[in-house]
Amino acid sequence: MGALTPQECAGLARRAALSRAAVLSPAGESESVVLWEDEDSVAWLNVAHDSRDTGFHDHDGSAVGVYVIAGGVTNEGLPADGTRRVRRYRAGDSFWVPGSGIHRMDHETGAVTVHVYSPPLRAIGYYEVVDGLLQRTLGPPDEPSPASPRLLATLRDADTAAPDRSLSPA
């Protein structure tokens, strides 16, 4: 079959959420469970027991489709033009990020999501500002991604310096 499009990943995430009953513990650290993995895709069920910011990251060439089962998440792409685009998603919503995309997600406490990656996730690139430059660090796909506090502060400072720019509404 081959790699799926980002839109196909989002559709698979929605179908997986609606057709599979997976139960994770109601307390403790956030957790993830692999729902399936084949040569074309891998699906993860994620539960955020506490609010969690993924920091800016990429999926090392894998497209992702996300379906929100419960709670809410915020997704923000890394802006190239200086205009921040933050979107909020609630239970029943789905969205996708292309394989070349850089984004961050903020999971509210209790958020439950299904993520489908194609091709299967091999690594995650984490982004942060170091000595004034944007740097990417490659990490394993099965560990929580670190926040990007300096990069986020740089974007917020740019918003403050240009008051005519505003966050996009959800």
Task: Say what each PLM segment does.
Residues 65, 79-107:
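Short acidic-glycine-tyrosine-enriched beta hairpin
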Residues 108-157:
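Double-stranded beta-helix
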Residues 40, 46-47, 57, 78, ...:
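Feature captures hydrophobic
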Residues 1-22:
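N-terminal leader/capping segments at the start of a protein or of a new domain
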Residues 47-50, 60-75, 116-119:
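Short, conserved beta-strand element in jelly-roll/cupin
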Residues 53-55, 74, 94-104, 122-123:
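Histidine-centered metal-chelating micro-motifs
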Residues 24-55:
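A short glycine-rich, His/Asp/Glu-containing loop-to-beta-strand
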Residues 1-2, 146-170:
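Actinobacteria-biased recognition of intrinsically disordered, low-complexity terminal regions
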